[in-house]
Amino acid sequence: MGQNSSERPIPTTDYKLLAGEELLRVDSFPPRHFEHSPSTIEQIKRLTNSPDTTTIGEHGPSVASLAFDVSSQTSVNPEVSPLNDQVENLSLTPDHLRLYEVLFGRDSLRVAIDLISSYPELARTTVLELAKLQGVTYNSEREEEPGRIVHEARDKDDAIAKDLTERLGWGWPYYGSVDATPEFIRTLTAYVRRTEENHAFLSQKYIDKSNTERDIAYALDMAVDWITERLSANAEGVLEFHSELEKGIENQVWKDSWDAYHHKDGTLANHTAGIASIEVQVTTYDALLDAADLYRHVLDDAHKSDSLIETAEHLKSVILAKFWTDKDGGYFVLGTDRDDNNTLRQLQIKTSNMGHTLNSRLLESNDPAIQRKRDAVVAHIASDKLLNVSGIRTLATDEVRFRAGAYHCGSVWLWDTHHIAKGLRRHGLDELADNIDRKLLHVVDTTKIFPEYVRGDDADTPSINTDRVVLWDSVNQRENIVEQPPQEVQAWTVASILAIKKRLDRRQRAIDRRKKEIL
């Protein structure tokens, strides 16, 4: 049990148990209560270590999460405990709310890309800092590879780093993700394309991990080469993950909990071979096209541009053929694994991941077959099996492993939902996208935090987990934490909410301008 938790008697009926599962313990974490809705601006300043809004991005990328600074909050709930006791409790920051106060590659890049219109400097410094940490050699403990973008950058003397090294054998910084590298390319190219600095950024110098002076164009080359090598490592040409470290992250994508990747019957994906996630393929497809455009029009390398376009088009054909099923009205499956004969198998479960195909060039086509796929995905996203009061569930309610409070198997992640809403708007589905955005704003107004995720239940009001629920899974011979409290200030949640508010402000200003023109 962590700080500020208490173990309570094990209930017999409160939690869903699958075959072979046994409830081991339930640790309670009374939530901290805040009187006012939090400020997006204040929290993004804290996350980026910026003294004011004009310096957001100047002091480096965002950390992944923080706990609220209770000294700046009115945080009293007399019904929970006597006033004096509660103030004393709130003066402490529980350990379970301080898990990710460091740089994570994918998180920082998602924050940067969501806020690039308002804070382009944040995208610049995020790309630059990650370029400095980009892999330069092969190291199994760190899962480092040349060109690979870091997953988690901790000092080796950090208390959490020491624990992970002792228990899991990780080295630092740790590179166990496959989505950070295509996200890096997408953010880099977006910054070059959309800012005044433009292609001059490609000449920006930095010192890499080998203490060698490089420029951003070199970091782009290395990231692109890492992706193309990964794609060529299998016959199908998909970007797979497979940890070579005995206790490395098993699912090296944003849904990185160990049970997130599974088959229709609940059987876990085969981790002895490569696994490919649908949203990673989609992000990689877009990253290849973005890079190709830069090579052709800025770096004057038409040959490399043509090669990347050819690779992207092949990947697109594989996505449409291998990651689509006509079952249940048709949808993009979570991903693929491999059987004992190394044959690709679909992970045929309905997840929020399918929605990521909407926020991509993948489905931008007049081809009736592709339009039917797009419409089928939208129908699933809008169904009550995925959509609830808070947003889009990570896993549909009719799937075997669905649990409303599970980390990636039923909960609602606000950044994930926001990303999908942007995709809906991209295809002209503004009304549905606006409805989903309102759900996200309602979550923050209700919980008074920027939660990492919220419950995916059928309640009328958004809520967060207050227990850590631990099961024993006899089938897979391991413990499974099926519920845990979320972080209070998750960076990509803050970025999503801030992006929504900025968009609404722009819309209102446009309306006001039109009114003035009429008058």
Where are the predicted features?
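Extended glycan-interaction surfaces of carbohydrate-active proteins
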Residues: 11-103, 131-169, 232-275, 314-412, ...
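PEST-like, low-complexity acidic/proline-rich intrinsically disordered segments
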Residues: 2-5
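Aromatic-rich carbohydrate-recognition surfaces in CAZymes
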Residues: 101-245, 278-281, 347, 411-427, ...
